[in-house]
Structures are given as structure tokens and as C-alpha cells.
Amino acid sequence: MMAEREEDDDTEEAWMQLRPTEPLPSQCCGSGCSPCVFDLYHRDLARWEAAQASKDRSLLRGPESQSCPSKLNPETFVAFCIIAMDRLTKDTYRVRFALPGNSQLGLRPGQHLILRGIVDDLEIQRAYTPISPANAEGYFEVLIKCYQMGLMSRYVESWRVGDTAFWRGPFGDFFYKPNQYGELLLLAAGTGLAPMVPILQSITDNENDETFVTLVGCFKTFESIYLKTFLQEQARFWNVRTFFVLSQESSSEQLPWSYQEKTHFGHLGQDLIKELVSCCRRKPFALVCGSAEFTKDIARCLLCAGLTEDSYFLF
């Protein structure tokens, strides 16, 4: 009977049941991660083909999602427990996840993670950048904006403290080194502020880093500006300046006095970018993060302002 069972296990049908399933487009976050979910699929498919050819199922064994807190892994989704959720605006949350003991997440400033969610039996993945300091111990935080028709938004809005969420990473091609640039020009729209936060904090936390920083945050209204207290605190450092561009407000009269002189109205366009570049105290290197349309437009404006393609990075 045992021999018959082993023969049944080696039938074509049995092997086809073990064949990896190709991911749906919704399972790709679209941020250019390496390894991408499709890279992992092709890896697992090659492993399956080798196992089938040799009739050796042990070759199929690979990393699976870990159900308890563990070290972050770019190939394996790891569960982290939600320990706090703060609503920053009507549609945006700051979510804190626990790390085991006093461990650190292990990301370099500006790197991002991939979140996996399941809604209506459909698996989806999206990229988010932690906003907590790179050296934060025992936790990490992410900034998540929810959209009315977004699948991941439905998943995030179902979260409660004590729930777990699955992440993998880190990913990202920008690596900041102290004093690497004379000045950083940080241009962010909405939640594109996220990768700028740990980069900025790593500079101000390091008394030996003398990099100048000019941060420009683009938002619809004053109320929609994220992390106001943090940004105000950062602007007190001798080497940091912050500016804001509000697209749906037209007057500074209703703004707090501390924002009136550093807020522009309308959109971040070519003229303002030329002014920002010319006002930099040292030769700037620009970091840009926002929607695809925003990053494309800003890249064009930076070139018109005299920067070269190797003088900016698009997240």
C-alpha cells in the first residue's frame, strides 16, 4: 500500500497541485522591488520544475510567511503586531508596529517595505516607507493614506490595535551617507513626505553631519499637512529649512504666523523650483517623492533649473 501511495503522489495531477500559482497584477506593488513578487514566483517555479524532474519533493521547501515576530526578510512576509493607530487627517493614519524586544527594524533611511493584504479573497501588495527613526528600538511606524475606493485602504481601515499585518523588505536604491552632499533639496507631495522623514532625522540626530536641508512639502490645505510638530521641530535646527506649497488655499491670513512666510500657494512649478535651487546654500542634490505625475514634472523642472540627471533621485 505504501508503494502505491508513493506512486499516486508522483502522478502528473499530484505535481500540478504543487505548481506555484502565478501572481495577479494586484499582487505587485509596482515600486520596482527586488525581489519582486514575480521574481519570487519564477524562483519557486524553477524549484518546482527541478523537483518534478527529479521526483524529489524536498526540493520544494522554501521560506514561508512567518506567523510570529521575527527578523525582516525581503523574500518572506513576516507578521508584526499593531500597537498604536493615530489618525493624522481624515484619511491618513500613523500606525506603529511592535518589534521583538528592543530590536531595530534594520532599514537604512529612505528604504521601504511591502505590505500584504487580503480583501475579498484577493491578495494585494503595496509599498510604504517607515517614518520612524532608523535607530528606533522595539517599534517602527508607517504613514498610510486611505482612498475611498482603494482595496488596501479597506484592509488598513479594518485594523485594530492587537491585529497583525505582514511585511517584507527592505527595498530601495537610495542610501544616504552623512555629509555625502552639500545640501539636500527634499521635494515631497502628500505621503511622499514619508521617505524624507527618516533621512532628515538621521541628519539632525548626527551632530557631525553638517548637510544643509531644504524640505518642501506639497499639500492641498494647511489641515492636510502631515507631522506638523515634527517638521516644526526639525526647522529649528541651524541647517534645516522647511517650506510648504498649498494647492487649495490662496491666502496666508488664516495660517499660523510661523507658517505665513514659508508657505506658497498654487502648485510647485518651474519658477518656484528655480528659486529654491538658486537659494540653496550649497550645490544641491534633490530627492523627489510623490505621485508618478508629480515626480515626472519635478524632474523636468529640476533639469530646467540647471541640475543634471545625476543630481536628483526619484523615489
Curated annotation (Swiss-Prot):
UniProt key word NAD: yes
Enzyme class: oxidoreductase
Catalytic activity: 2 Fe(III)-[cytochrome b5] + NADH = 2 Fe(II)-[cytochrome b5] + NAD(+) + H(+)
Entry keywords, A to Z: FAD, Flavoprotein, NAD, Oxidoreductase
Limits of the FAD-binding FR-type domain: 75-177
Record's protein name: NADH-cytochrome b5 reductase-like
Organism: Homo sapiens
One Pfam family hit: FAD_binding_6
Gene that this polypeptide is encoded by: CYB5RL
Family under the similarity heading: Belongs to the flavoprotein pyridine nucleotide cytochrome reductase family.
Cofactor(s) the protein requires to work: FAD
Protein purpose: NADH-cytochrome b5 reductases are involved in desaturation and elongation of fatty acids, cholesterol biosynthesis, drug metabolism, and, in erythrocyte, methemoglobin reduction.
Alphabetical list of InterPro entries matching this protein: CBR-like, Cbr1-like_FAD-bd_dom, FAD-bd_FR_type, FNR_nucleotide-bd, Oxidoreductase-like_N, OxRdtase_FAD/NAD-bd, Riboflavin_synthase-like_b-brl
Binding site residues for FAD: 157-172, 182-214
Gene Ontology BP term (one): bicarbonate transport
Superkingdom per UniProt: Eukaryota
Entry GO MF terms: cytochrome-b5 reductase activity, acting on NAD(P)H
